[in-house]
Amino acid sequence: MQKIAKQALSSLSSLAKSPANAMGSISHLPAYGHRLLPVLIDEISRDEPDRVLFYTPRNGQPSQGYDEVTTKIFANAIDRLCGWLDSQLGSPTVSKTIAYIGQNDLRYFIIMIASTKLGHRLLLSSPRNSVEGHVSLIKQSGCELWIASSGLGHHEFLQDLHIPSVEAPELSELLDPTLAKPYIYQKSWHEGKSDVLALLHTSGSTGLPKLVPVYLETAATVDGFHLMEPTDGKRPTGVEWTGTRQLCAMPLFHVAGICLGLYSAVFFNWIVVLPSVGPIMQHVIEDALDHISLDSAFISPSVLQDISKSSRVLEKLSKLKFITSAGGPIPQSVGDLIHPRVPIMQTMGMTEGQWLASVVMHPDEWAYYYFHPRTGVEMRPYSEDLFELVFVQNPKLSATQPVFKTFPDLDIWETKDLYSRHPKHPDLWKYEMRRDDLIILSNGEKFNPLAAEGKLISHPWIAAAYLTGRGRFQTAALIYPDDSSFNNSDDTIIDNIWPTFEEVNKSLPAFAQIHRDFVKIVRTPFPCTPKGTLARNETEKSFNADINAIYDRSTHGKPSVHINGTTEDVVRSGIREAIETVSGLVDLKDDDNIFTRGFDSLHVIRLAGLLSSAFYQPLEVEPGTIYTNPTISQLSHSVWTHLEYGPQDRIHHSEVTLEMLAKYIQAFEPPRESKEHIVLTGTTGEIGSYLLDDICKNDKVAKVWCLNRSVDAFQRQVDSAKSKGLSSNWQSKAKFVRYDVTSENLGLSQDDLEEIKNEATAIIHNAWEVNFNLPLSSFDPQFVGLQGLVDVCRATRHKIRFFFVSSISAAMNWPSDLLGPVPEASISRFDAPINGYGSSKLVAEHLLSKAARSGVLSLSVLRVGQVAGPVRTLGEGSIWTRRDWVPAIIDASVHLRALPLDLGSASILDWIPIDLLAEVIGQLVVPVNPVVGQENYYNLLNPRTPSWKDTLPGLKAHLEASFSEKFEIIPLQEWINRMRGAEKTIVKEVSEGSSETARRAQSGLKLLAFFETLASETEGSRGLEWSKANALAQSSILACMEPVSSAWFDTWLTQWGY
């Protein structure tokens, strides 16, 4: 125990010193998961005063440059606001609830910490809330003061509620570096963990918003990401991205903005770049990309949807290392356009559960999540193909389960979020929908509308799509057109987009398909949640008249403005009228910024559409034009210039040029090596025979050198292939070469050696002594042969891709209860092998790893599990060899007329048939998408794992039909005892030659000690799990492999003559 404790302390010390976890010059060991934000901010401001937390755009405009906000300035701003709050509320002798609503800037984070320091509760009500929503939250929270940034303070409902309102200090005032009066938060962890950081609220998508308190303890669970062990070498995203400079283009009052804005800067040492003020749209991202260097950007799916339609912005986005998104699923069509240009990393969060720890995925799996095991989530079946994400409280995971800080009385919290499992990787999950997103038609049929909506919005004329039909006989669609098509007639738009509907209908079940008569164009944007996703229930209510119109075959019109563009003054007057029409703003001055007066993204879209149809000559006013010209004077001048001189097409010309470059650039890339030349050792063995057959069928393989020790290997190979039903038509590719591990240059002739050195591209080392009883010292000849192959690699013209067929026995003693699943990585514990054979494989892995790291070769280690008999090849010799332990159990069971109820610790059947294993290895050796890296490890086990009990009924039925006798099913230990009791009878019958079943059962007697070992460990007692992500990613055959089944057992039993 003392040794374990010392190791644990050593690990903690290493963790504290590692760059990914270090907090600058702070010398003490951080209490990750128990750090109070107000204390931590003051601490790092003292110890690291010059560390940059944020970049904020000067005067809210990136074009004016950015101001650095260091820890010292941030902490000082918090103290300054504490003083201001004191002046408004008096000394904090009594905790009060205050509300803040403001421009999307750093003041949100400043007031959160300041109110917490003073013991007050801060309500953050979304600016998008309806009056009814604001009033409900004020009443729920007991709000006593409404604070707003300039231009957002006047709300009539506050007077009705007798709630005073006050304007917040400007951000520039708060960031003044002049030292403010310090306000010290002196509470310990236990004293302060229940203090409220902020009162957030649900989206209100299913009714009025409900309060969700975020406690300091809740925030600290995100800090607990530091405590999570790496998974396949990756830490949770927050820790993995330490030190990155990321644009946080999210609303800062929302949990997504708080997590990836405030928490990421303070807990994880990110440098967070805040967006320009105003609605977060495509131009906000582009402004930041144009004016500050970034590593990444955090962008909502709705904005990514707009970006995907602009080749100009996509080109700028491609300069980032990656982009992050959250708040909802990215439509497949949008992600498919973006991820070839820049990797997409999705994160998942929720108001009640903050930031859900996930691990960085391969860019090709951008649509999926890998949730870290320490989140304590379970995926519970909901319907045939859908699973619900459910949090299950686990006291051991207290520091990393925020949802149970929000709901401390719950043991289980159902998120109502539904996911589908990755078809190849069982631990990857794709978000599909909310439970209440399902549409149930009047005939009881139900379907998921989100995938269809995602395909629809891929059309450039569609900005948003909403499918409906709850309680109706037919699905209907509301379409909100994109800016580019907004001023077209409904019929024109439907004509243009209908081919996309036809494609969508192909993916929908017949009962859910959309008829042309059930499509309606709407000119008002759909209601959205604060995170930018479609608010389905609110949309259903808000567009009830339009929905009824579809079914009633009625239509509606829209307002219009007409502008005679003869002079710039006339244009200015018309634009003023248009702004008044869409927003109701009647007292605007020509130089007033419309966004500081309450203009939002919905107003922009309506104004753009209105102006695009307002003139007597063709004109398209894009939303971006309004954002970059936010005053009447600026907008009228831009429109007048367009009318007078025509559009400037330089940007369009640039986009066309880039598209032409992209079209032809691949033709000018250097050609890749098209054919493989492979050295394969041990082809006459069981695996080797099937492997030779598979790789010789591959058109990408030009030549195979078959290295065997026997002088008659060729004839043996031909006989084996014919017997097994394999092709022997490989002579044109295969060359048989005898080799000797004890001789110089492996005993190869000079011609053969030179040929291999000049032509070989890969080596598959399959030959190895298979004997589980030998000690490690007996495997010296194997290591001498391995050294000879590595020496060959040193002299080859091509860098050899070396595939070593290893074994899971190299890690069967892996302590998975302490270290988790056996990784697809180098095994550093030399007590992991189960026997001398496994030790020899582990030593070989390490020797080859040394060669790979020295640049001699690139290594792929293939850890093979239980190899079962073939299931596809039907030759007479195509049989599961009776020397194996599974056939031995069957032969013994036939003699006893009894089958064991379980196989003890081997009851989980992760077996791979030998012919399918050869195909899996073939995919790894000749991959569709080559893997980059000096070392790759693959655990080759069947990803689908039934138990022995699952196959037992079919096995029993087959044997009973074959022998016309009943077979018992008895516990494994009883079965072993019966075998021991039958030993004398079996030996006697074998000696007399009177019983074939006794002769076969004799092999079971030889393995009784092994069976005793299985019985001593009950089913699942070992708890050994194997990571398979790498293998599943590279082999579609393994990923789609069927589980061991009764049908497979029927094949094997037939092979054995039963």
Swiss-Prot record:
The keyword Oxidoreductase applies. Fusaric acid is phytotoxic to plants such as cotton and banana. It has been shown to induce programmed cell death in plants. In addition to a mild toxicity to animals, fusaric acid exhibits acanthamoebicidal, antioomycete, and antimycobacterial activities. This is Non-canonical non-ribosomal peptide synthetase FUB8. The modification O-(pantetheine 4'-phosphoryl)serine is found at residue 601. It holds the Pfam family PP-binding. Signal peptide: none annotated. InterPro entries: ACP-like_sf, Adenylate-forming_Reductase, AMP-binding_CS, AMP-dep_synth/lig_dom, ANL_N_sf, Far_NAD-bd, NAD(P)-bd_dom_sf, PP-bd_ACP. Residues 680-921 are annotated as: Thioester reductase (TR) domain. PANTHER family: ENZYME, PUTATIVE (JCVI)-RELATED (PTHR43439:SF2), PHENYLACETATE-COENZYME A LIGASE (PTHR43439). Contains three distinct domains: an adenylation (A) domain that activates the substrate amino acid which is subsequently covalently linked as a thioester (aminoacyl-S-PCP) to the 4'-phosphopantetheine prosthetic group of the second domain, the peptidyl carrier protein (PCP) domain, as well as a thioester reductase (TR) release domain. Induction: Expression is positively regulated by the fusaric acid cluster specific transcription factor FUB10. Expression is also positively regulated by the secondary metabolism regulator LAE1. Residues 43-365 are annotated as: Adenylation (A) domain. Keywords: Multifunctional enzyme, NADP, Oxidoreductase, Phosphopantetheine, Phosphoprotein, Transferase. Its EC number is 2.3.1.-. One of its GO terms (molecular function) is oxidoreductase activity. Non-canonical non-ribosomal peptide synthetase; part of the gene cluster that mediates the biosynthesis of fusaric acid, a mycotoxin with low to moderate toxicity to animals and humans, but with high phytotoxic properties. L-aspartate is suggested as fusaric acid amino acid precursor that is activated and further processed to O-acetyl-L-homoserine by cluster enzymes aspartate kinase FUB3 and homoserine O-acetyltransferase FUB5, as well as enzymes of the primary metabolism. The gene is FUB8. Residues 566-643 form the Carrier domain. Pathway: Mycotoxin biosynthesis. PROSITE patterns: AMP_BINDING, CARRIER. It is an enzyme of class 2 (transferase).
